[in-house]
Amino acid sequence: MYNYLSGNHFDKPFLLPANVCPVVPLSFMKAGVGFEFIDIDESHAMSTEKCLTAIEAGKYSGLVFVHAYGKKYDNKEFYRAVKSLDPNLCIIDDCCLCIPELVDSLPENVDLCLYSTGYAKFIELSYGGYASFRGYEVVDY
C-alpha cells in the first residue's frame, strides 16, 4: 500500500474507518498522504452512508474499506455510488483479514485490493502480503 500511495501523488486526504489496523494510517503518514477517520456502523464496517455524504463534498482522493473480522462484504453498489460521485476517487479494498483469493481481475470499481500473509492471518508466512491494482498485479515479499 505504501508504494501505491507514494507513487500516485494523491493531493487530498483519504477516508479511513475508525477501526482500521494502525499499520494503515502509519503507511499513509510515511507516504505523505493525508487521511481522516470516519465512523463505523453496527456491522463494524465503514459507515457507507456517512462516507457517501463526506465524498459529496469533493475534498477526498479516496477511501479504504476494511472487511472487518475477515467478513467479505458485497460492496458493488456502494463502490458504484462512490464512483458515480467522483470517478477519479481511489477505492482501496482492504481484505487483509479475509481468506486470500487469487483472481485475474479486481472487483468492479476497486483500484487496489490488499491481502495480508502476516501474523495470525489465514495464510501466515510471518510477513508481508500482496496486492492487485488496476492493470497490474504486484507481489511483495
Report the location of each language-model feature:
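Conserved active-site segment immediately N-terminal to the catalytic lysine
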Residues: 93-130
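Nucleotide-sugar donor-binding loop of glycosyltransferases
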Residues: 18-20, 39, 95, 116-117, ...
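Donor nucleotide-activated moiety binding/catalytic core segment of transferases
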Residues: 1
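PLP-dependent aminotransferase-like
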Residues: 4-86, 90-92
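Active-site C-terminal subdomain of aminotransferase-like
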Residues: 136-141
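Short, conserved loop/helix-junction motifs that constitute active-site signature segments
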Residues: 82-86, 106-108, 134
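Active-site-proximal flexible loops/turns
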Residues: 46, 74, 100-102, 123, ...
